[in-house]
């Protein structure tokens, strides 16, 4: 693919040195991000937690723009989980308003750059004002064919699987289904029709999945950045992509270096969890 490096880094910058090392034909088709660390970023600066969320919007904007310019097909951002309702009311209120503000401000840009906005999760249970702006974005960006932007809102990986099972049962009762397999379940997930994530980035150094895309990340490569989300920029994104390209995805098999020579019997393993 053809990429304009001038859109990805300033000439002579550290980011340019990183982006020149990327193999643009081996980028992830689907990139997922757990945007973590806003509160700790604010606390280290003596600021209220909500200021960390405001600062995090810049990282969202830059990650979306850069991913689209790189040619990544799908970007999924974990914006608000079902567990986040436990946070202070003022923090939840701020998050919802920042979401509405971001979508309003970026809507024209998303349309111009061919970005399709697709909320996932139980987002229709949010406040009516949030639902309205999301529905407007869905309609306005429906023709976007450059990148799909999934925004996970009121999202839970377990709830996603439960919702999929409920819909399957309902269709089965209506005579629409004869059997259930992995492919069937995939067709009923929030991300139906999209490839599973190739790379999951989590910021802030935490080693948790936080109930995110539990079905879809079975074979996803995971990159943990020590950076808090508000400080996550192009450099950190390029480092994660380079780390991804340095890995060999085996999907439960063995690497070429570890494969048995032709004609030699393979050793018996203790199961899929044995060895590395």
Annotate each language-model stretch with its function.
Residues 1-276:
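Flexible, compositionally biased loop and terminal segments
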């Amino acid at each position: 693919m053809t990429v304009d490096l001038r859109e990805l880094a300033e000439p002579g910058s550290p980011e340019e040195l990183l982006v020149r090392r990327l193999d643009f034909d081996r980028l992830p088709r689907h990139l997922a991000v757990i945007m973590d660390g806003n509160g700790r970023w604010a606390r280290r600066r003596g600021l209220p937690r909500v200021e960390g969320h405001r600062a995090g919007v810049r990282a969202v904007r830059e990650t979306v723009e850069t991913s689209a310019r790189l040619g990544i097909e799908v970007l999924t951002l974990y914006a608000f989980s079902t567990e986040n309702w436990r946070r202070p009311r003022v923090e939840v209120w701020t998050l919802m308003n920042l979401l509405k503000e971001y979508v309003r401000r970026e809507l024209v840009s998303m349309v111009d750059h061919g970005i399709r906005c697709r909320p996932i999760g139980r987002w229709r249970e949010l406040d009516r004002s949030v639902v309205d702006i999301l529905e407007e974005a869905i309609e306005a960006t429906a023709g976007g064919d450059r990148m799909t932007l999934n925004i996970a809102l009121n999202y839970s990986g377990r709830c996603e699987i439960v919702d999929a099972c409920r819909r399957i049962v309902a269709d089965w009762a209506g005579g629409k289904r004869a059997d259930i397999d992995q492919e069937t379940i995939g067709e009923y997930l929030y991300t139906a029709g999209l490839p599973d994530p190739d790379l999951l980035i989590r910021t802030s150094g935490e080693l948790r999945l936080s109930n995110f895309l539990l079905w879809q990340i079975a074979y996803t490569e995971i990159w943990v950045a020590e950076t808090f989300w508000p400080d996550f920029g192009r450099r950190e994104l390029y480092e994660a992509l380079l780390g991804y390209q340095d890995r060999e995805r085996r999907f439960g098999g063995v690497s070429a270096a570890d494969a048995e020579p032709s004609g030699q019997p393979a050793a018996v393993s203790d199961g899929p969890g044995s060895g590395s």
